[in-house]
Amino acid sequence: DPDATESETGTSEAGQSTQRRAAGDGALFARPQEFTDRSTPSSLGVAAETLALLDGFRTDRRFREVAEAVVATHADRIRASPLEHVSLVRATERVESGGVEVTIAADEVPEAWRETLGKRYLPGALVAPRPATDDGLQPWLDALGLDEAPPIWSGRDALSDEPTAYVCEGFTCSPPRTDLDEALSWLADRE
């Protein structure tokens, strides 16, 4: 509706949706949801995967709860025809497995580490740099309006003032490593 001036986002039995309302009207207009992937990915699947991916940056579980609700709501549809719902399948995989996360604690990421990450195939991995110390992290938290560090950064300081990598997969994390290749080899060792 071109005259819509307010929007609301919520979860219904049909899943995550955005509704627009004309000023003073009170009537809600629901935008149709695209469940299947066609020439473009399903917006519902992309949104659910993105929320699951970004959940580690929140101190509550709100993003994850919405992503879980979306994939649970559409579980039968996903199982019945996974090739038509690839984006929802990807979202389901991210919700269930947590994916791969690489947190780098360093005041400046070494160029060699950037090259390694650029050359290494880490499908769907989330790389999350952060300052080397909690004191350095505090201005970031203040800018984001957070009282405490989110899980992806919490307790992940640099070791001995050296850039440090924390590699996680499936909600399990490697020990902190000051050698990025060694940290990433932890992924291969898990297979």
Segments the model singles out, each with a brief description of its role:
Residues 1-191:
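Glycan-recognition and catalytic cores of secretory/periplasmic carbohydrate-active enzymes
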